[in-house]
Structure formats: C-alpha cells, structure tokens
C-alpha cells in the first residue's frame, strides 16, 4: 500500500475475531478496545435487560463521547522500558535508560498522574507546567528521585524562569535545559545548586555539525554558543553540566534516518564529555513515532539497538564513557490511549463520488491536525462490522467545508457499513495533541459543546473502573463567550 491505511478497505464484512492492531478487535460484529466493548457503551439500553453492563455505568452513554483509556499509557511506558533494557543487556551497554513523559502532548491530570505512577520522569515547557508539578508533589505523586526536565524558552525574569527557581527549592532533581544564554543569569544569581542541561540546535536533517548550524530552527544553541554556555556552567559555583539535549525531529518512522540525524549530536556529546566530565546524560528528546494508522511499521527494539551501538562506537572513538540515555516520549505515550466516538446521524448522496456520512460532532474541531496538517487517524465502526461495507466520506456537523475526513486530497479510502441505523464509529490514535490544540473546555468552532468524557482504568485485579465527566453545557459555552457576563461599557466622545 502506498497510502495511509485508516480502516477497513473492503466491501465485505469483517470476520469475527479480526484484530486491527494490539488493542482493536472484532467480537460478533462489534468493536472492542482491549477488553472494553465500545458498542455497548451506547447500545446497552437497547439490548436485553440482563445484557452486558459496565460497573459504574449501567446505562447507555451520550454521543459524542471521548474515551481516555489509562491502561494503554502504562502499557506503552512499560514496553519502551523493556525494549531499552533488552538492548542494554544484549550490547552490554554500561549506561542507564530514562523514560521521560513530554507533557505538552497531553497535560490532563489523569494522564500526568498515570505517567508518574508508571515510573516516568517528567518533562515540562511552561509556567503552568510548574504549577502542575507542585500539585503532583503535594499529592505525593512526584518522588524526590524523579527527574523534572524544564524545556522551553525561559529568559531571566520571566514567570517561567522564576517558577523554576521555586520548584527547585521544593524538588531536588530539577534540570533546566538552556535554550539561550539569556536563561543563565537566573540560575547563576539564584544561590541554588542546579544540574543543567544544554539544548543543541540539532533539529532537522543533517550529516554534521555545520549542517546543524545552517538549519533554520528557533530551538537550541548553535555550536559556538553551545560551547560558550558549557564553559559558563562549568565555571559557575553551584552549577553542574549534566545533560546534552539533541532533538532531531518529530514522528520519525525511518530508523536509518533517525540514527543518521542523531549521529552528529552524539559526536558533539562525546567531544563535550572530553572536556566536562560531569556531563552524563544524552537526551535525544522526542521524535519517537506512534501508530496513528493501521499500516504503521517501526521496530522500536531495532532503533534502541542502533542508538546504543552508535553511542558505544562514537564514545569509544573519543575515549569517553557512554552516556545514560533519555528520551522524551509525548505522542508515543499518549496517542493510543485516546479515542473519540460519534454517531452517524444522516447520509447524503448529493451526487458525490461516495456518499456522505454525517456525524454528530466536528472532525476539524476534535482533531485539528486533520485539516491543518492533513494528518490521518484510524476510523472504524463500533457496530455492524458483520455487515457489508461501502466507500464513504465523513462530514462533521459544522457548516465548514474543511470539516471532512479523510483529509482533502488524501489518497486513503474510508469504508464503513452500508447499514446506518445505530451506526457508531470511532477515531483512534488521537490521544496526543488533538485535545490540547483544540482547547480543553474552550469554545469550539460553530459553537459546538465539548463532548462527554469517559475515563477508563483498571484495578489490580483487572476490573474496569469508570469515571464519566460531563461535557459542556449550553450555559458553559455561553459563559466562555461572554454572554453571561455583565460588561461595563464606557462611552467616550471624540
């Protein structure tokens, strides 16, 4: 296939027991997410009185409905930790591996709580993130040995820079990653002891340090400034150069390209390590790809082996110890834990090449990347999977011509059941960035309210636990837009 596979691509029914990936499969014509029957979230009341029910729900739920499946986050973290542990053992790699959650992908409380509970270190990038870290400290969820990585722009005197100093007083393992020399005075004058990271300008395709310097990116320090910053940190009382940060891209699905981009940063780390022996962590940042379509193919173990082996080779050449490895996993951690379910409310032929299935929500508001970037996500029916399919187009309920799926000019076909009564469908792999970009509890395009949200977890015995968060009310939407506020108007004469 030369196009992203976003769902079923045949007119025939889907066989019972068919598995789309490691968490979506078919049971008697209905779609299951792990052990959760998604169809029965909506159809419970329509089945026999003694039919399936879920503890804590016991009734049909409204559509649209957002699903937050927390066990998936734990599975993803555990899987990556196991991958790097296997690679370390196979290669005899002397350094450690640190898994950090990049919180900008999804900063919801239940997500942060789950990542910390799964043993992840914590990465942040804004002043509000610092407040979140304080809340996690107060609740006993951020242990003293857990690293907090402070990325983002934080010039001296800004609220973010000042908040980092406050957090350092409460949490010892805080590492500010310097983006610009203007960030150093706050650390130098604080009277506090800091382990410090330096972000190198490494983003984008390159084969050596010169090409990294030439690339047009606002992130990180160029080579000359990097070395200058390292000397300042090393000479400063109370500061210790600890981390080199070299992020090279986002959603990099080609292992060869990923390692090719990381090689010059690893060489820079080794040269720095020759001069500054306190430097011990190589942080490759983000870029780890996540499966958002059904054709996803990336060998995480092969990547880990290649990365560690490359570090061994380069560090051996420069006669320095291999570094501890850190990755900041945002999309990888959260993409698959989130899904968004809708009901097909009408079908329009409209003399189109394929019939329009109109859903009871907005595609472009719920998944901004579909219209802004032409991004693809998995779309599957929850019901009627044992019935014939046809190729269709999806339309959102808004009056916007961009509220469609597949994205405009996409080569990917979308097939859904011909039978449309009680036809529910889900978008999957949408748990990273989409809700944050769309604005949580904010005002949506065409004044659509935010959907209800079902948070799903499991206890130690594997029993499901549910928490249903109500969607926005009309009053909340109007209040966001200022209609429930009495405004003082001041008239002026010209």
Model-derived features with residue positions:
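Charged (often Lys/Glu-rich) extended helix/loop segments that serve as interaction or gating elements
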Residues: 11, 38, 57, 306-308, ...
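N-terminal capping/small domains of soluble enzymes
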Residues: 1-157, 379, 391, 405, ...
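Conserved, mostly hydrophobic/aromatic
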Residues: 73, 104, 126, 198, ...
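Active-site-proximal beta-alpha core segment in soluble small-molecule metabolic enzymes
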Residues: 92-281, 290, 310
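Short glycine/threonine-rich loop-to-helix capping motif typified by GTGT followed
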Residues: 253-260, 291-303, 334-346, 409-411
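Flexible, glycine/charged-enriched surface loops at secondary-structure junctions
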Residues: 63, 89-94, 275-281, 317-326
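A glycine-rich phosphate-binding loop feature that marks nucleotide/adenosyl-phosphate handling sites
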Residues: 247, 281-289, 322-334
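Short connector loops at secondary-structure junctions
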Residues: 245-249, 282-287, 390, 395-400
């Amino acid at each position: 296939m030369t196009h992203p596979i976003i769902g079923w691509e045949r007119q025939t029914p889907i066989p019972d027991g068919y598995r789309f990936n490691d968490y979506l499969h078919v049971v008697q014509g209905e779609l299951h997410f792990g052990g959760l029957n998604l169809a029965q979230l909506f159809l419970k009341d329509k089945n026999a009185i003694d039919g399936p029910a879920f503890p804590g729900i016991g009734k049909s739920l409204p559509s649209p409905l957002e699903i937050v499946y927390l066990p998936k986050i734990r599975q993803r973290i555990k899987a990556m930790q196991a991958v790097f542990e296997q690679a370390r053992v196979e290669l005899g790699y002397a350094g450690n591996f640190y898994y950090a959650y990049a919180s900008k992908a999804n900063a919801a409380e239940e997500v942060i709580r789950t990542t910390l509970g799964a043993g992840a270190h914590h990465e942040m990038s804004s002043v509000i993130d610092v407040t979140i870290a304080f809340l996690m400290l107060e609740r006993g969820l951020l242990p003293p040995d857990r690293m907090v990585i402070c990325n983002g722009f934080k010039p001296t005197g800004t609220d973010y820079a000042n908040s980092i100093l406050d957090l350092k007083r409460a949490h010892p393992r805080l590492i500010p990653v310097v983006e610009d020399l203007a960030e150093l005075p706050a650390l130098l004058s604080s009277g506090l002891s800091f382990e410090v990271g330096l972000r190198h300008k490494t983003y984008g395709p390159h084969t050596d340090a010169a090409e990294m310097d030439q690339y047009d990116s606002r992130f990180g320090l160029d080579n000359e400034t990097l070395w200058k910053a390292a000397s300042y940190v090393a000479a400063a009382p109370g500061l210790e150069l600890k981390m080199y940060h070299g992020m090279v891209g986002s959603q990099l699905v080609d292992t060869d390209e990923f390692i090719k981009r990381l090689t010059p940063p690893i060489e820079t780390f080794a040269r720095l390590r020759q001069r500054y022996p306190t430097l011990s962590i190589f942080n490759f940042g983000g870029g780890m790809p996540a499966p958002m379509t059904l054709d996803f193919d990336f060998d995480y173990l092969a990547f880990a082996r290649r990365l560690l082996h490359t570090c061994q080779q380069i560090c051996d050449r420069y006669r320095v110890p291999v570094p501890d490895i850190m990755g900041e996993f945002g999309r990888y951690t959260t993409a698959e834990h989130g899904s968004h379910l809708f009901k097909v409310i009408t079908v329009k032929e409209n003399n189109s090449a394929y019939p329009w299935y109109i859903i009871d929500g907005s595609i472009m508001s719920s998944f901004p990347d579909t219209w802004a970037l032409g991004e693809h996500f998995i779309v599957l029916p929850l019901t009627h999977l044992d019935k014939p399919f046809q190729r269709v187009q999806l339309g959102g309920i808004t009056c916007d011509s961009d509220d469609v799926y597949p994205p405009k000019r996409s080569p990917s076909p979308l097939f859904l059941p011909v039978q449309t009564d009680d036809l529910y469908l889900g978008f999957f792999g949408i748990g990273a960035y989409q809700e944050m970009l769309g604005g949580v509890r904010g005002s949506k395009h065409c004044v659509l309210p935010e959907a209800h949200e079902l948070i799903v977890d499991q206890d130690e015995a594997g029993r499901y636990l549910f928490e249903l968060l109500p969607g926005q009310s009309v009053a909340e939407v109007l209040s966001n837009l200022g209609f429930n506020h009495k405004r003082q108007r001041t008239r002026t004469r010209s």
